[in-house]
Structure formats: structure tokens, C-alpha cells
A protein has these predicted regions:
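An active-site-proximal "capping" alpha-helix that borders the catalytic cofactor pocket
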Residues: 41, 87-102
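His-Asp-centered metal-binding catalytic motifs of divalent-metal-dependent phosphohydrolases/nucleases
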Residues: 59-81, 92, 96, 114-121, ...
Length: 178
């Protein structure tokens, strides 16, 4: 009986993530570059989390945060004329709270995701595996999208990446030699 309950929870969470994914695509309608960005961050975050064998609740938080981590970008562009990381951290959490609440996400999940959004461009005092994996996934995508040098990749590898699989992917994507 317990297995059926767990399977039902997993199915419900997958459905919630799919609804969130579609809601984010709708939110970013017409901005294919940003849609591609959060889709790639989600893919890497999920891969790293699964390979690192995180528990299911942590995986759900990581996936939710990866889909919504840049939710404040358009608001920042409208309010400030730019969308730097600190501004995203400022504007994103309230937007995520509203969206996650509308989609029926539990309060504890929403609160952790809001925290991760509020800190995903802050690389000191990373206080959880979900935070670490989100930062690594975002770095993997940003390094490629921004065309950073091998020296910059190596610096990020040494200073930012902590998980075994985040490091592995970073090395293989960038062909850096450690």
C-alpha cells in the first residue's frame, strides 16, 4: 500500500512540474533564448541531482527552482532597464511565490524555492545541496551561453563546483584538463 502512495505522490509531483514548466514557457512567451536557458538549467540540475542520488523531495525542490530561477528577469528589465543577478534575486521570489501558490505547490517547497531564487547569484555560504546543484547547473549553461574562456571555466570548476557529477559535466563540456 505504501508503494502505491509513493507512486501517486511521484506522479502528482511530475504533473506539477509539467504544469510549472508550461507556465514558465507561457510567462516567457516570445523570449525563446530565456525559455531555452531555463530548460537547459532544469535538465542539468535534474541530471546532477539524480546522479548524486538526492532524495525525492530535494529533487522536486531542485527541479522547481531550476525552472523558476530567473523568473524575475522580465520584471527587472521593465523596472530597472536591466536584469543583473542581484536584481533577479530581489524581484524573483515574490513572482515565484505567486506562481507556485497558484499551481498548488506546498508552502515549504515554495519557501525553499523562493530562498534559492533569492540567492542563486550568490556563491558564498551555499547552504544546501539543492542550492549547490542549482548554482552548478546555472553555471554550466551560462558558461556555454556566454562563451567564457577556458581559464574562466577552470576558475569556476575550482571555486564553484563541488558535486562529483557537476564537476564531471563541467570538465567534459569544456574539455578542461584537471
Amino acid at each position: 500500500m505504501k508503494n502505491l502512495a509513493v507512486q501517486s505522490d511521484v506522479t502528482q509531483n511530475i504533473n506539477m512540474l509539467n504544469k510549472l514548466h508550461m507556465a514558465m514557457i507561457e510567462l516567457y512567451k516570445g523570449d525563446s533564448r530565456r525559455i531555452q536557458h531555463f530548460c537547459k538549467v532544469h535538465s542539468y540540475a535534474r541530471l546532477i541531482a539524480q546522479m548524486e542520488n538526492v532524495d525525492y523531495k530535494t529533487l522536486f525542490i531542485i527541479e522547481t527552482a531550476a525552472l523558476t530561477h530567473d523568473i524575475g528577469i522580465h520584471t527587472c528589465e521593465e523596472k530597472y532597464g536591466e536584469c543583473g543577478g542581484r536584481l533577479q534575486e530581489k524581484e524573483g521570489p515574490a513572482l515565484a511565490k505567486e506562481l507556485l501558490e497558484r499551481l498548488g505547490f506546498e508552502t515549504d517547497i515554495s519557501e525553499r524555492v523562493q530562498y534559492l531564487i533569492a540567492h542563486h547569484h550568490t556563491y558564498s555560504n551555499i547552504d544546501g545541496i539543492d542550492y549547490q546543484m542549482l548554482v552548478e547547473a546555472d553555471f554550466l549553461v551560462n558558461m556555454y551561453e556566454d562563451g567564457v574562456s577556458k581559464d574562466a571555466v577552470l576558475k569556476a570548476y575550482n571555486n564553484i563546483f563541488k558535486t562529483e557529477y557537476g564537476k564531471y559535466i563541467c570538465k567534459d563540456l569544456s574539455l578542461i584538463h584537471i
